[in-house]
Amino acid sequence: MAQVINTNYLSLVTQNNLNRSQSALGNAIERLSSGMRINSAKDDAAGQAIANRFTSNINGLTQASRNANDGISVSQTTEGALNEINNNLQRIRELTVQAKNGTNSNSDINSIQNEVNQRLDEINRVSEQTQFNGVKVLSGEKSKMTIQVGTNDNEVIEFNLDKIDNDTLGVASDKLFDAKTEKKGVTAAGDAIDANALGISGSKKYVTGISVKEYKVDGKVSSDKVVLNDGSDDYIVSKSDFTLKSGTTTGEVEFTGSKTTKFTADAGKDVKVLNVKDDALATLDNAISKVDESRSKLGAIQNRFQSTINNLNNTVNNLSASRSRILDADYATEVSNMSKNQILQQAGTAVLAQANQVPQTVLSLLR
């Protein structure tokens, strides 16, 4: 090697090696401080891209797991409301069995009907007001719930939100009870015929001293003859058409006795009679069966969501482990690298000092 002063080759080599060890020491310290093997794309471009895709999947699957938990919450909320509807239907069925008993009076039936109506109103209230995060789940406002359970498009689970109320269950009050309106019988009072004299001669019959008033009656007698009794004598009124005119009498009016006959008429009264329909219990059984079917579907979807969550969590764990192998720093390796490069730094610094002294040997030739 030529003895030169302008260029100190040994010093340059030593500086280069010192820079390398310093850079390696810096990388080791960075990895140890961050815990990551890849802190930028320059550390491992391909590994960084793979790890980034893993991160996207992990984040998406973690959110999908939370979505599935929300799906469980929706189905649990809906099932809880259906359970209360079922309780009301069970009570209505119990009351219907009671109402079918022949020992009940109309008052008893009315009392039973009152509670049934309240229970039916409560079913409709539960249907209309049960909601999850502002979404009504039983009113038919939203017929289907879609839950995103994957990281890609169309990775969803859908389940129906059945409309459950009195109409869809077929248990409206008129489906269980018949309400018939009947007319009460009426009593009559008022002057109809005032016969103060009665004469019979031979084969001819004469009626004198009779005052006749005309009354229009909407209805009819319930038998061919009506028997009136004042406590001592009976009076017979024949059910036949007759016309009384001056000089001419058509038809027959027969009286027994010679007392004033009075008729009074009150307006017919509407009476509502409640009867339990023959198929009321079958109707209620069908309604309970519909509620049970909806509840079973919700229970099944809860189990499905739980299985989905378990699978998502397993996938997240596996992807996290794979990403860790690519992205995370191995502390044993990095500590070893740091120690090695620290030694190289110390050695390089010492050697550089020696290399810088090499040109001094050239000066000895000039003495």
From Swiss-Prot:
Intracellular or extracellular location(s): Secreted; Bacterial flagellum
Family, similarity comment: Belongs to the bacterial flagellin family.
The protein's role, per its UniProt record: Flagellin is the subunit protein which polymerizes to form the filaments of bacterial flagella.
Protein name (Swiss-Prot/TrEMBL): Flagellin 2
NCBIfam families: PRK06819.1
Superkingdom of this protein's organism: Bacteria
Keyword Nucleotide-binding: no
Principal subcellular localisation of the protein: secreted
Keyword Transmembrane (UniProt): no
Protein species of origin: Proteus mirabilis
Source organism phylogeny: Bacteria, Pseudomonadati, Pseudomonadota, Gammaproteobacteria, Enterobacterales
UniProt KW keywords: Bacterial flagellum, Secreted
Induction: Although swimmer cells have only a few flagella, the elongated swarmer cells are profusely covered by thousands of new flagella synthesized specifically in response to growth on surfaces or in highly viscous liquids.
